Amino acid sequence: MLRLDLQFFASKKGVGSTKNGRDSQSKRLGAKRADGQTVSGGSILYRQRGTKIYPGVNVGRGGDDTLYAKVDGVVRFERLGRDRKQVSVYPVAQEA
């Protein structure tokens, strides 16, 4: 007769909880302005790690890959080919 001896091991020892329960704070990454929204120069548009979204027209890239507006205008999220995205800021024409 075949007898299986299954043992399940605890992922945490059942002793104390002082070494458990740590987690890092969220970094609040992602879009900070929506498509079509009016922004002023210097406004943060997108916080990211790496280049998930590339800078387009009138958009700069900071040291931590944050995208920011260089001029006042309207935000546009656009596609760059099949697998890339970019964000651009187009100035609004001033009416006289």
Curated annotation (Swiss-Prot):
NCBIfam families, alphabetized: L27
PROSITE patterns, alphabetized: RIBOSOMAL_L27
Record flagged with keyword Ribonucleoprotein: yes
Similarity comment text for this entry: Belongs to the bacterial ribosomal protein bL27 family.
Residue ranges of the region described as Disordered: 14-36
Example GO BP: translation
Record bears the keyword Ribonucleoprotein: yes
Pfam families: Ribosomal_L27
Entry comment on modification after translation: The N-terminus is cleaved by ribosomal processing cysteine protease Prp.
Annotated disulfide bonds: none
Organism: Bacillus anthracis
Any single Gene Ontology cellular-component annotation: cytosolic large ribosomal subunit
Protein name: Large ribosomal subunit protein bL27
Gene: rpmA
GO molecular function: structural constituent of ribosome
Keywords attached to this entry: Ribonucleoprotein, Ribosomal protein
InterPro entries recorded: Ribosomal_bL27 (IPR001684), Ribosomal_bL27_CS (IPR018261)
Propiece residue ranges: 1-9
